[in-house]
């Protein structure tokens, strides 16, 4: 269960850093943690700025213009960036503080694993196992972020955040969610569905070896539609989806099961809008067919909604699934809880040091030709 793309916090990296950014009575953040957070906030703000009519990738003037974030808040970009960086830093301190108050003990093996993961990201990147070596130290080290600070603001923070979440909402927690409430949420918000996609085109390769899609003839399309509509009728009469798939595999001469089944919150699903709408309209135990796309990219779908009530014991009984349901139910509330604690946190801010780091530090001009040049490429010693 991940709560942020890169958010870590283990032992605060103070011993290797001469400068600090924020601190409480018993905790201190290295300036590198602030720089990392400022960079993360910059990237997010830039994505909002790109929606502006007069956004210019060759200039950093957008930093002095108002942007609108995902919550609809409008603010001058550079101020938004600094505020978000500060908010992130205070969240790091809050999580550490609350772990102590909740008496949460994270095993050393778990912390070591998180640190090791950060080291991997730092040295070879998160996609090295897939053949893409992109060391994250190249992105951060030049700005003054050390491995310690990077780890503090990424994998360790995720580890601690998740541990605190479980301590608060798990069994025996200060805000424990009962099995009854979790089950109620599951039944009301989750959907158990399956669908079978059938391409209305064939794929071939030309003489150069390039793949090319060719739309089926009207006769071929009607054959597919008739077959899937027949399955739909069988399901609507109480038939089994497993039987439908077995029949389709036999008729198509394929041993591969191309159907997809999921139990999830439909609104948060990554499936297409058309599928979401079709599944959302279905009654339990019913099926429907629909066509998505056109020409040489069209797909015909058979969609089916199962009875979510039959999944309670088997789904929530699985520890990993239960954690996922709990996260879906309480993650937004927990985020606001942490934000609220951050607003009440007693801390010191090392303003004279923090003010040395401006949002434009991260600006990279992108010319119309897509050639990039860095405008503020001065390297700094790692913090």
Describe each PLM feature range:
Residues 1-79, 83, 343-344, 348-383:
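Short, low-structural-confidence N-terminal segments
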Residues 13-17, 138-222, 270-383:
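PPIase-associated folding chaperone regions across multiple families
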Residues 27, 34, 39, 198-203, ...:
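Solvent-exposed coil/turn segments that connect beta secondary-structure elements
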Residues 43-81, 100-183, 215-219, 266-273:
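Charged, solvent-exposed helices and adjacent loops that form client-binding or oligomerization surfaces
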Residues 84-89:
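Hydrophobic alpha-helical transmembrane segments
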Residues 92, 96-98, 102:
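N-terminal accessory alpha/beta regions
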Residues 103-111, 240-247, 289-291, 349:
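Surface-exposed patches in mature extracellular/periplasmic domains of secreted proteins
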Residues 226-274, 314:
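Peptidyl-prolyl cis-trans isomerase
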């Amino acid at each position: 269960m991940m709560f942020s793309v890169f958010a870590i916090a283990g032992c605060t990296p103070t011993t290797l850093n001469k400068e600090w950014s924020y601190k409480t009575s018993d905790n201190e953040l290295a300036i590198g943690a602030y720089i990392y957070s400022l960079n993360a906030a910059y990237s997010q703000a830039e994505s909002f700025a790109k929606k502006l009519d007069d956004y210019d990738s060759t200039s950093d003037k957008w930093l002095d213009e108002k942007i609108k974030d995902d919550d609809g808040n409008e603010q001058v970009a550079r101020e938004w960036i600094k505020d978000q960086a500060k908010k992130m830093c205070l969240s790091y301190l809050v999580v550490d503080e609350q772990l102590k108050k909740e008496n949460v003990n994270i095993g050393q093996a778990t912390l070591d694993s998180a640190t090791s993961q950060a080291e991997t990201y730092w040295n070879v990147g998160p996609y090295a196992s897939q053949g893409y070596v992109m060391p994250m130290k190249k992105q951060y080290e030049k700005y003054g972020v050390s491995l310690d600070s990077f780890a503090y603001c990424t994998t360790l923070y995720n580890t601690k955040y998740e541990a605190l979440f479980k301590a608060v909402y798990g069994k025996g927690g200060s805000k424990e969610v009962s099995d009854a409430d979790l089950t109620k949420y599951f039944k009301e918000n989750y959907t158990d569905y399956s669908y079978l996609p059938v391409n209305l085109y064939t794929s071939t390769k030309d003489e150069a070896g390039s793949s090319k899609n060719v739309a089926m003839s009207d006769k071929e399309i009607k054959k597919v539609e008739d077959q899937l509509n027949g399955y739909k009728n069988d399901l609507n009469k109480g038939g089994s989806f497993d039987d439908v798939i077995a029949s389709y595999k036999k008729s198509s001469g394929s041993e591969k099961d191309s159907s997809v089944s999921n139990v999830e919150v439909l609104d948060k699903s990554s499936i297409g809008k058309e599928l979401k709408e079709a599944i959302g309209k279905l009654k339990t135990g019913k099926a429907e067919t629909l066509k998505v796309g056109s020409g040489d990219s069209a797909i015909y779908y058979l969609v089916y909604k199962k009875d979510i009530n039959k999944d309670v014991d088997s789904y929530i009984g699985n520890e990993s699934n239960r954690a996922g349901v709990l996260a879906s139910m309480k993650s937004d509330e927990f985020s606001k809880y942490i934000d609220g604690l951050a607003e009440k946190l007693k801390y010191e801010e090392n303003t004279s040091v923090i003010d040395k780091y401006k949002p434009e530090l991260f600006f990279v001009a992108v010319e119309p030709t897509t050639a990039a040049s860095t405008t503020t490429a001065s390297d700094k010693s790692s913090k």
